[in-house]
Amino acid sequence: MFINKDIVKLAMKKNNIATQTELAERIGMSKSQLSQMLSDDFCPIKTNVLNLMNELKIPFKELIIEETGEHMEQLELITDESIANNINRYEYKLDRYTDVKNISPQKDYTVLETFAGAGGLSLGLEEAGLNSIGAIELDKDACKTLKKNRPHWNVIQGDIVNIANNGIKNHELFTLDKELDVLSGGYPCQSFSYAGKRHGLEDIRGTLFYPYSQILNELTPKVFIAENVKGLVNHDEGRTLETMLDVFSQSGYTVYWNVLNAWNYDVAQKRERIVIIGIRNDLIKKQKKPFAFPEISTTKPVLKDALKNVPDSQGTPYSEKKKKVLELVPPGGCWVNLPENIAKDYMGASYHSGGGKRGMARRISWDEPSLTLTTSPSQKQTERCHPSETRPFKVREYARIQSFPDSWKFEGSVTSIYKQIGNAVPVKLAKYVGLAVIDYLNQF
């Protein structure tokens, strides 16, 4: 008895593992150990088990079923059928772009937002020309922000799990009486539980991707927009994204994704997000031109462009100890510009951990875009110090960097406001994505 090398090679291809060296590293062994395992002389069954099989004249599969039948579903992972059902996320990556700057809607397009937060995605889609018919959000401060800025929006405050289970059409604030054009939202990135075979929605229960999928299946919009952190691409070795793509495909959508950098779309911030677009299959059959992501803008704003004449606002100061350290860092610099003894003391164990770590003790320059804003302005690993003052960015500066207009007011404590802005999709990035969707829908 030996390991089927053909099945291993096929599984490596499906999981984007190029070499046996890479496979060996992933499973925590040396290349020579893996080569020995895959040789014709290697038997994966221990000698005592073989002796038991031979003495009792019981085949291996029958013995395993008899002794550990409850785990057989896991053993079925490596079968021709299950491997054939796996998908390669990179086959869904779309590198097609189109100029959308002069696009305007030719019809009254509707959008329902899930996980709306403080409204970055919603506002951007509105600026593109989509009309909000609902915004679902749990956080009370974010809901107050949405209601303050858009009193006419149907802000549906509540747990999306309960809303989806009860049916969005049954909610008193959902009054759409026609086909929905766009469903949008950025659900959290969470690992899934695998049973060995794909069962569509059954694979994703217990995650916040599940209610999003429920609402998608209930409303069957023409198009959906899902955005997330760039890390989703390789989260859980790609299985998380691949399961999402599988579920979307089973729901009747042709799916595309790409990672878009906000700096390429008139935002003074290097912030990368994965954007997933799904188009209902009946539209795919009728389309005259395919969907394309928005073409990169020639404008590359930097911090001085974003913060020009920014209004004063609340903010969080550094501690005196941290302020003394950051005073030593020049604009555009970070911990590498500190004296060695101060850098070692400030960074602690991170000083010896290797890697880039250029976010620590980082002061942004006026002549560069900001690095990705976080939900807290003074986290040690991801500091974003003001260029000419030794302090974190204030909340209106945060909002400007995220391309919110000054007219967009935020509700809640300073901590809550930082969190709302830091979690948001940059408004201008959302607008570009919305224009690309409108450009596609205009053909029907």
Predicted regions and their residues:
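A short, Lys/Arg-rich alpha-helix, primarily the initiator
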Residues: 1-18, 26
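DNA major-groove recognition helix of helix-turn-helix
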Residues: 12, 38, 48, 56, ...
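Residues within the helices of the helix-turn-helix
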Residues: 21-22, 50
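Recognition helix of helix-turn-helix/homeodomain-like DNA-binding domains
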Residues: 28-44, 66
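S-adenosyl-L-methionine-dependent DNA methyltransferase catalytic core
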Residues: 29, 69-133, 178, 247-250, ...
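DNA major-groove recognition helix of helix-turn-helix/homeodomain DNA-binding modules
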Residues: 46-62
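Core alpha/beta nucleotide-donor-binding catalytic domains of modification enzymes
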Residues: 70, 74-220, 230-234, 239-241
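Conserved Class I SAM-dependent methyltransferase catalytic core
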Residues: 205-279
